[in-house]
């Protein structure tokens, strides 16, 4: 239901009339979510489980965090494998993602990206996914977007927060972007990873909620620069927090002549990409997007779009040290 939701403006405005109207619905959403979570008894997996999650609907940076954690765990484990629900895809039963066989329509865009990092399992039933992964040699599991899923017992829970987005207007869905209250998410977290610029107010707030939680910082960096004439680009993406991609382009020195945002997990049409391509050509700019968006572009137009590859880079070695010590 939430797969193709575009973040409304009032999600950043706590005083909006719309927020006040939707607050009763938010309370109902919270009640139903809590009942669902508390009605499940977590199952202990046969290998350690690292859970990556957030308290907002998209945009915090879970997918690049999954890649980072997976790569760091390889220093201690032979076969880290990833569990994801496959949001945006129609396959519901457990399946190992094959990038040569599956499309984003089947397994979702994020699962296709994860499958390039490590064996990735899609399935609504995370317990069955975990069993399948272990049967195929997994010695540690990374559970993507697992904070609101109690089906598996977690050995380490990492809360991901974007330093600009933070918690939006601080209201629960649908009045705001929160899936659960920040206090709840922080209370059950073992580590907090803040992505973006330093935000001392946010760090102080986290410590006030849970004084013992270690806080780490990381930044998004472009790994492969796109050959761009005169540094002129037109960017587009369908992310939970699209402004993050635009800001990354600006910070890396590109002149962003135009930027178009779509709903998270948006499936692109030929008409949309043709319009974007024509717009970029009209201003003598290169059309750029993220890898997550590129996998959903109709094949006939992929030569017209350049991919800006981005990875998450920790501020220092402390995050890796804490990660490996806790498992």
Language-model region placement:
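A transmembrane-helix-recognition feature enriched in membrane-embedded lipid enzymes
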Residues: 1-48
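Residue-level signal for inorganic ion chemistry
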Residues: 28, 63, 114, 144, ...
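Walker A (P-loop) phosphate-binding motif
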Residues: 37-100
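Phosphate/Mg2+-binding loops and adjacent switch elements
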Residues: 87-210
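Conserved beta-strand/loop subsegment of P-loop NTPase cores
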Residues: 157-161, 186-196, 209-230, 234, ...
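G-domain G4 guanine-recognition motif of GTPases
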Residues: 191-200, 218-224, 236-241, 262-268, ...
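Redox- and metal-dependent alpha/beta enzyme cores, enriched for Fe-S-associated oxidoreductases
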Residues: 222, 226-270, 324
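Short, flexible loop segments at boundaries between secondary-structure elements
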Residues: 263-264, 304-327
